[in-house]
Amino acid sequence: MLDSKLLRTQLQDVADRLASRGFTLDVARIESLEAQRKVVQTRTEQLQAERNARSKSIGQAKQRGEDIAPLMADVERMGNELSEGKVELDGIQAELDALVLSIPNLPHESVPVGADEEGNVEVRRWGTPTAFDFEVKDHVALGEKFGWLDFETAAKLSGARFALLRGPIARLHRALAQFMINLHINEHGYEETYTPYLVQAPALQGTGQLPKFEEDLFKITREGEADLYLIPTAEVSLTNIVSGEILDAKQLPLKFVAHTPCFRSEAGASGRDTRGMIRQHQFDKVEMVQIVAPEDSMAALESLTGNAERVLQLLELPYRTLALCTGDMGFSAVKTYDLEVWIPSQDKYREISSCSNCGDFQARRMQARWRNPETGKPELVHTLNGSGLAVGRTLVAVLENYQQADGSIRVPEVLKPYMGGLEVIG
């Protein structure tokens, strides 16, 4: 969340910057609540001081042999008024807190200004899409030909937007995840992490999914215990490792990577990508998270994005890198790069990774800090996250880009060790 001091001292400037994201900040409501808070707080503090003075005078009156009943009545009345004032103050603060939690992050000055995805800026391209000399098939046709990609059975088990993978395609899916994890551990310096797939609400609030995006989550309600949510991304569990912690400067940067299933209701995706594996309720992803000192976060974003790009390069999949504009960035990000991989059957690039610097936005929500050796004081860390990569979409890209005229699939060179040396499937 944003710094409350910034909202008090530079509210209009914050509103102007948020407008570039298409977000309208309710300045009047915040100003009104802040004014109410100040009035009630001042009144409460004055009442507390007066009550303390009256309480002290009771002892003095007692020593003089005076009737203390009126003073006792005053103290009791003031105590009741203080209790009422606290309830009122808590109510105002709760509304302010809810408003602040609904405000997205401020975009970095280097982010291109735009209203939607049309305003995104292509930064670079890598690779050249293959010019096939036959009619390309999509991944659904390729997978169903041999019975290795089974949406009908998945629908029988779980409904729409699920997939059942079998045989060589299931093995290829596993190979991709193992290859990605090994690359990030061995070449990029990440620590492999196994995390819970179910988290409590504070973890999701810490990374920004709650309270604003609850409809996108799968929730498990338990009688007598805290509700649990299936993770929409390992970003939630990985980033929250440092929730409530004060890290030593020597611990930074922290670099975590995890391969997990992800669960999303896709509440806003009705009618989009209904065929195949592009948009699923359950999908696997290899997620990278970095926890860094504030001055290092922009350089870390470039490095993290490069880590994700390296996966695509080694798989020899054509892709492009986009700098997202202000109107297309995620809620918690100050700056985001999207990687889009070439999908031959659609004749276009599709998102396969999103890499974001969240600045101190998530850290403030989580109270994740480090001790600055120059000041000796705890300060907020900066957090970054990125897909390295979405495994299902990478599988789609491999199936389509490595297809042959007879419907068989060549195995990418870097995956052959994970596939027992298999050269072709199908």
Curated annotation (Swiss-Prot):
Catalyzes the attachment of serine to tRNA(Ser). Is also able to aminoacylate tRNA(Sec) with serine, to form the misacylated tRNA L-seryl-tRNA(Sec), which will be further converted into selenocysteinyl-tRNA(Sec). This is Serine--tRNA ligase. InterPro entries: aa-tRNA-synt_IIb (IPR002314), aa-tRNA-synth_II (IPR006195), aa-tRNA-synth_II/BPL/LPL (IPR045864), Ser-tRNA-ligase_type_1 (IPR002317), Ser-tRNA-synth_1_N (IPR015866), SerRS_1_N_sf (IPR042103), SerRS_core (IPR033729), tRNA-bd_arm (IPR010978). It comes from Pseudomonas savastanoi pv. phaseolicola (strain 1448A / Race 6). PANTHER family: SERINE--TRNA LIGASE (PTHR43697:SF1), SERYL-TRNA SYNTHETASE (PTHR43697). Consists of two distinct domains, a catalytic core and a N-terminal extension that is involved in tRNA binding. It holds the Pfam family tRNA-synt_2b. The lineage of its organism: Bacteria, Pseudomonadati, Pseudomonadota, Gammaproteobacteria, Pseudomonadales. Keywords: Aminoacyl-tRNA synthetase, ATP-binding, Cytoplasm, Ligase, Nucleotide-binding, Protein biosynthesis. It is found in: Cytoplasm. L-serine binds at T233, A234, E235, E287, S387. ATP binds at R264, S265, E266, E351, I352, S353, S354. SUPFAM superfamilies: Class II aaRS and biotin synthetases, tRNA-binding arm. One of its GO terms (biological process) is seryl-tRNA aminoacylation. GO terms for molecular function: ATP binding; serine-tRNA ligase activity. It comes from the Bacteria. Pathway: Aminoacyl-tRNA biosynthesis; selenocysteinyl-tRNA(Sec) biosynthesis; L-seryl-tRNA(Sec) from L-serine and tRNA(Sec): step 1/1. CDD domains: SerRS_core. GO terms for cellular component: cytoplasm. Homodimer. The tRNA molecule binds across the dimer. Its EC number is 6.1.1.11. It catalyses: tRNA(Ser) + L-serine + ATP = L-seryl-tRNA(Ser) + AMP + diphosphate + H(+); tRNA(Sec) + L-serine + ATP = L-seryl-tRNA(Sec) + AMP + diphosphate + H(+). Belongs to the class-II aminoacyl-tRNA synthetase family. Type-1 seryl-tRNA synthetase subfamily.
